[in-house]
Amino acid sequence: MAKSQRTAVVLVAAGRGLRAGAGGPKQYREIGGQPVIYRAMEAFSRHPDVFAVQPVVNPDDSAMFTAAVAGLKHEPPTNGGATRQASVLAGLEALAKHQPDIVLIHDAARPFVSDGVISRAIDAASRTGAAIPVVPVTDTIKLTGASGNVEDTPDRARLRIAQTPQSFRFDVILEAHRRAAKDGRSDFTDDAAIAEWAGLTVATFEGDVANMKLTTPEDFVREEARLAAQLGDIRTGTGYDVHAFGEGDHVMICGVRVPHSKGFLAHSDGDVGLHALVDAILGALADGDIGSHFPPSDAKWKGASSDQFLKYAIERVAQRGGRVANLEVTMICERPKIGPLRDTMRARIAEISGVDISRVAVKATTSERLGFTGREEGIAATASATIRLPFNEKTWSV
């Protein structure tokens, strides 16, 4: 592809996804621990040849969209229309001010689009002007009539399954969409069909069987199982932290402000529960400890909320393609009493970590009045974290 080609993406995410079952629009449901739309958008956002990603969303989904794609670079979302075709046109019109050379049009419900497919889409549009990814049909296809009886068996060798991203010269597909809208044509099921109607020759390029569209509840179950099977490297880490009491009227424990007659002596907010948990996660990653990532000698972390330390550790797991399986913290103290706040702390850890509360445990014990915790001079915490990473044979000893 010539370096002068500017490529943008229309990410279509305005549908309601009713066939996917309960749980809201399918593009905002999680798959493999991440929202479907996040996975789709991230693939394009990180691609070196894509300069703009234009999301098209349902106006009722604004809050869900913002939460689902937090941290990803994209254009301000534009509202979709009553049909997919109308939504694509809205996305193209929103991109017109950027004057891209190439545009890729992708369904947000396809979260497993690869860098290779994206690169092939850009290259194909640059060479041909209009192209779509396809995969061969492996089953025998039957054409049936109104009676349900078989009327014909088409030649499987000529059949292909169309996928997205479908790629086009921007000016050509924008004009085709505008013409279709002007002529009152709203029955096209994909952008290639509009291009064909407009008289364009649509080329094909190699798609990817993994780049499937999530449509039914069974699709989600199957893909969750596939992703879980890929995360065969199960690791566990442990952490420990302690802080002495000082002056104050509260302490931070597991992300929760707890009223107390004393405060913590600490460089940050002194949240021993979260500090131990961060060390456990970093330990599972073999990625140093909290002090190496957030040195107490750095004034930047003076009084810092420990929420950001835990978010950082969770992001390190995600960067390795992993998922958190379980988080557990045990608080060791006489006071304050942890029991009444246990579920509040679990919920807060789950919220910070982006995991279900069923994967978070908070326990409490005492040292039977022994040692510094028994004398109520401070609080200690131990933690464990279990994570799953993609299996990499090269990291295993022979």
Swiss-Prot record:
Site positions per UniProt: Transition state stabilizer: R19, K26, H267, T366
UniProt binding sites for 4-CDP-2-C-methyl-D-erythritol 2-phosphate: D241, V242, H243, H267, S268, D289, I290, G291, T365, T366, S367, E368, F372, R375
Function: Bifunctional enzyme that catalyzes the formation of 4-diphosphocytidyl-2-C-methyl-D-erythritol from CTP and 2-C-methyl-D-erythritol 4-phosphate (MEP) (IspD), and catalyzes the conversion of 4-diphosphocytidyl-2-C-methyl-D-erythritol 2-phosphate (CDP-ME2P) to 2-C-methyl-D-erythritol 2,4-cyclodiphosphate (ME-CPP) with a corresponding release of cytidine 5-monophosphate (CMP) (IspF).
PROSITE patterns with a match to the protein in the record: ISPD, ISPF
Keyword Cytoplasm recorded: no
Catalytic activity from the UniProt record: 2-C-methyl-D-erythritol 4-phosphate + CTP + H(+) = 4-CDP-2-C-methyl-D-erythritol + diphosphate; 4-CDP-2-C-methyl-D-erythritol 2-phosphate = 2-C-methyl-D-erythritol 2,4-cyclic diphosphate + CMP
UniProt entry keywords in alphabetical sequence: Isoprene biosynthesis, Lyase, Metal-binding, Multifunctional enzyme, Nucleotidyltransferase, Transferase
GO molecular function, one term: 2-C-methyl-D-erythritol 2,4-cyclodiphosphate synthase activity
Region (2-C-methyl-D-erythritol 2,4-cyclodiphosphate synthase), start-end ranges: 235-398
Cross-referenced InterPro entries: IspD, IspD/F, IspD/TarI, ISPD_synthase_CS, MECDP_synthase, MECDP_synthase_CS, MECDP_synthase_sf, Nucleotide-diphossugar_trans
Annotated site residue numbers, Positions MEP for the nucleophilic attack: R156, K213
Name of this chain's protein: Bifunctional enzyme IspD/IspF
Name of the encoding gene: ispDF
Pathway: Isoprenoid biosynthesis; isopentenyl diphosphate biosynthesis via DXP pathway; isopentenyl diphosphate from 1-deoxy-D-xylulose 5-phosphate: step 2/6; Isoprenoid biosynthesis; isopentenyl diphosphate biosynthesis via DXP pathway; isopentenyl diphosphate from 1-deoxy-D-xylulose 5-phosphate: step 4/6
PANTHER family: 2-C-METHYL-D-ERYTHRITOL 2,4-CYCLODIPHOSPHATE SYNTHASE, CHLOROPLASTIC (PTHR43181:SF1)
Gene Ontology biological-process annotations: isopentenyl diphosphate biosynthetic process, methylerythritol 4-phosphate pathway; terpenoid biosynthetic process
Binding site for a divalent metal cation: D241, H243, H275
Annotated region (2-C-methyl-D-erythritol 4-phosphate cytidylyltransferase), positions in chain: 1-234
